């Protein structure tokens, strides 16, 4: 019995060593300072590295040439809390890419070539605290529900992009927001910007550079001015203007009122007709009795 165990010892040691190597395998061209960190910063990668440990928590991929992230990339990395994809060549996020990133706390997508942030992009990233989307020179569109579900988000960076406008609903859906960066965008101070300006006015304490750090182009002459020189009165001509949604509500309300009026008129006419017939019948009965 003991001789068998003695004979198996070298095999067990070899097996254990192999499992340890597999468990903490580090991708080539990357560094792994600890068992839960993979650092592939500045390695000239044109795609995501292979053999990333399944229990990775910090994945550093900045300063490479990675053009896209497969939608199923994060499925196997359920422990990932920190993902840095800054300064790559990303042009868009595949639908569902972040659908399994429920533990992700930090995400950096800055300095890429993103053009838009579609609705529902981060809806499963409920643990996300810091989101960096700045320095995307072609990012001109952020959908109204792009950040829906980010109830824990405290810091949002959208500076130095190509945003000329932003629906204020985007920011109103972030109850935990403490810091928002919007400077360096080509904002246009028209009536579409009015609601966002009022939100920024009320939440100026969340702007690291204050209202002074954000500029917009005046709708009249295109002159760039700091938001700090504007006030609610700067948008007073917008107060009486209706949006497309307002017009649709007015039209729908008008149709409903018209239909209700027709039904009410028909009902009233029917009641009057019945009353007249009943009155005529009673008159005939009274004449017959006489």
Language-model features: where?
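Membrane-proximal C-terminal cap and juxtamembrane stalk of leucine-rich repeat ectodomains
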Residues: 2-4, 13-26, 32-34, 186-290
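LRR N-terminal entry segment and analogous cap-like coil->beta motifs
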Residues: 33-89, 95
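Consensus "Asn ladder" position of solenoid repeat domains
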Residues: 43, 64, 88, 109-112, ...
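Leucine-rich repeat
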Residues: 46, 52-56, 66-67, 75-79, 90-91, 99-103, 114-115, 123-128, ...
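Ankyrin-repeat and related helical/solenoid repeat scaffolds used for protein-protein interactions
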Residues: 139-191
């Amino acid at each position: 019995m003991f001789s068998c165990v003695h004979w198996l010892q070298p095999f067990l040691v070899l097996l254990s060593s192999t499992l340890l190597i597999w468990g903490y395998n580090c991708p080539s061209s990357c560094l792994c300072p600890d068992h839960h960190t993979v650092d592939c910063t500045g390695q000239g990668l044109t795609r995501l590295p292979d053999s990333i440990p399944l229990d990775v928590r910090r994945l550093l991929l900045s300063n490479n040439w990675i053009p896209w992230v497969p939608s199923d990339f994060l499925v196997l990395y359920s422990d990932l809390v920190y993902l840095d994809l800054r300064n790559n060549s990303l042009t868009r996020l595949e639908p569902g890419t972040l659908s399994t990133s429920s533990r992700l706390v930090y995400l950096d997508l800055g300095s890429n070539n993103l053009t838009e942030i579609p609705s529902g992009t981060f809806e499963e990233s409920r643990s996300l605290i810091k989101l960096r989307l700045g320095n995307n020179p072609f990012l001109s569109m952020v959908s109204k529900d792009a950040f829906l579900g980010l109830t824990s988000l405290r810091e949002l960076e959208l500076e130095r992009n190509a945003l000329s406008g932003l629906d204020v609903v985007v920011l109103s859906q972030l109850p935990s927001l403490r810091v928002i960066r919007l400077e360096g965008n080509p904002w246009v101070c028209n009536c579409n910007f009015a609601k966002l300006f009022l939100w920024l006015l009320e939440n100026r304490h969340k702007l690291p550079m204050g209202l002074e750090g954000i500029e917009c182009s005046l709708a009249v002459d295109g002159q760039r001015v700091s938001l700090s020189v504007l006030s609610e009165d700067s948008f007073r001509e917008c107060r009486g203007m209706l949006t497309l949604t307002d017009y649709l509500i007015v039209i729908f309300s008008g149709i409903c009122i018209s239909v209700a009026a027709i039904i009410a008129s028909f009902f009233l006419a029917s009641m009057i007709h019945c009353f007249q017939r009943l009155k005529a019948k009673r008159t005939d009965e009274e004449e017959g009795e006489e």
